[in-house]
Every structure is written in C-alpha cells, then in structure tokens.
Amino acid sequence: MGRVIRNQRKGAGSIFTSHTRLRQGAAKLRTLDYAERHGYIRGVVKQIVHDAGRGAPLAKVVFRDPYKYKLREEIFIANEGVHTGQFIYAGKKASLNVGNVLPLGSVPEGTIVSNVEEKPGDRGALARASGNYVIIIGHNPDENKTRVRLPSGAKKIISSDARGVIGVIAGGGRTDKPLLKAGRAFHKYKLKRNSWPKTRGVAMNPVDHPHGGGNHQHIGKASTISRGAVSGQKAGLIAARRTGLLRGSQKTQD
C-alpha cells in the first residue's frame, strides 16, 4: 500500500497561520455616509506604500471626520497616476478625475473604474488586483442598475449606488516579467500561502503518488479519475467533463 498523498495530508488540516504580519491592513473604501451620498468629502494622499503579498501599491488617504474633530486614515488601493499630496474627492458630486470615488450612476458610459462595490456599502470587491479595471457599459435609471464588464470579460449588472474609483489599479503588467529565480518565488509565496514548491506527481516514486514511478516520467494510465474514487486515488483530472485542447474561441455572451 502506498503512502498518504499530498491532497490527503492537506485535507486532514492543521493549525492555520495567516501570512499577515507585514501587511498594511485591509484596503477598503470609506464607510458610506451622508457626505458621500449627497455631496462629497475631500481627502489627501499622505503616502503610497508597498503591501506585502499584494501586487498593487496602497495609498494612505487622510479624510477629516464629518462628525468629530479628528482625522481618519483610510487605506485605498492606489490607482495609476495617483501621487502623494493629491486631493481625493469621494461622493456623488465629486469630479470625474483619476483616484476619485463616485457611485457608478454618476459615471458616464465607457469610463474605466476599479475597486468597485458589488453591493452599495461593501467598500470594494471587484477589480482590485494590479492592472485590473471595470468598464461601464450602460445605465438603467428606471431600475437604478448599471451594466459593467469585469476583468474576466464577463458582464454583470450591479446597483448604480455601488461606488468605484476612477482609473486603473497601479502595477499593471507585473506578471509579464518572469520570476527567473527560485529565490524570488520563495519570497513571493512566503508572504502569500504555503503552496510552493510543488513536486509533480510523475517525478515521485510509485509509493508517493498514483503517477509516480517508471523508467521515464509519464503517467502511464488515464489521468481522469472518477468523483467516487477513494481519496488516495484522487490525483489528476478529477471528474473531468472533457479533456484536451479547447477548439475554437469561446465568446462571452452580451
């Protein structure tokens, strides 16, 4: 009988430790308040910082509290073109400039926005990775809905009251540059999650993995495996509907 394979060990679980020691904090929009719903509020970018484990830089924006005599620092995901000392306007009546936060209903069609809320007040959920953005396709004022195109190409209908930041998330093209060295991959995943390095099953011995063994590296049997297989057999293409290359291109539905 073979050894317990990797996915069985993972499934057994362990004490979880999050890799968040060097992180700056949760990157969110301001809490939706009266000032943003009916007018605008002004903040200033104090600092642009690197966030460990994240591809995009963060901007620390200071707003004056609308109710108390104090300043509040918010952490935004920095957009391309945002700089320290820049004024950030957030609200329904804010101007259409890069870095400003507006409800989607106040933004013209064809505008590029990022860190968009899925539901009004959730403080940002869509298009948050480096170089990502959402395109406004159209508005339906009768139903107070806005149609957007997500970074995946999918179309989505969300409330026109959901907010977004004008512009593209900074750090675009980051993935075009190869890591080149194992050391860089080591440091990258040290701050993300315990998923590196990954040994291929065909590189193992037969005792360690269903694909292991042989005089040269090959799987040696069909890599599709049934959904009802026991856990030690579940390696490869589990319950695959189809395998092989996709023929032709798949268009996203309008």
Curated annotation (Swiss-Prot):
<dbReference type="InterPro" id="IPR022671">
    <property type="entry name" value="Ribosomal_uL2_CS"/>
</dbReference>
<dbReference type="GO" id="GO:0019843">
    <property type="term" value="F:rRNA binding"/>
</dbReference>
<protein>
    <recommendedName>
        <fullName>Large ribosomal subunit protein uL2</fullName>
    </recommendedName>
</protein>
<comment type="similarity">
    <text>Belongs to the universal ribosomal protein uL2 family.</text>
</comment>
<keyword id="KW-0699">rRNA-binding</keyword>
<keyword id="KW-0689">Ribosomal protein</keyword>
<keyword id="KW-0687">Ribonucleoprotein</keyword>
<dbReference type="InterPro" id="IPR008991">
    <property type="entry name" value="Translation_prot_SH3-like_sf"/>
</dbReference>
<keyword id="KW-0694">RNA-binding</keyword>
<dbReference type="GO" id="GO:0002181">
    <property type="term" value="P:cytoplasmic translation"/>
</dbReference>
<dbReference type="Pfam" id="PF03947">
    <property type="entry name" value="Ribosomal_L2_C"/>
</dbReference>
<dbReference type="InterPro" id="IPR014722">
    <property type="entry name" value="Rib_uL2_dom2"/>
</dbReference>
<dbReference type="InterPro" id="IPR022666">
    <property type="entry name" value="Ribosomal_uL2_RNA-bd_dom"/>
</dbReference>
<dbReference type="GO" id="GO:0003735">
    <property type="term" value="F:structural constituent of ribosome"/>
</dbReference>
<dbReference type="InterPro" id="IPR002171">
    <property type="entry name" value="Ribosomal_uL2"/>
</dbReference>
<dbReference type="InterPro" id="IPR012340">
    <property type="entry name" value="NA-bd_OB-fold"/>
</dbReference>
<dbReference type="Pfam" id="PF00181">
    <property type="entry name" value="Ribosomal_L2"/>
</dbReference>
<dbReference type="InterPro" id="IPR014726">
    <property type="entry name" value="Ribosomal_uL2_dom3"/>
</dbReference>
<dbReference type="GO" id="GO:0022625">
    <property type="term" value="C:cytosolic large ribosomal subunit"/>
</dbReference>
<dbReference type="InterPro" id="IPR022669">
    <property type="entry name" value="Ribosomal_uL2_C"/>
</dbReference>
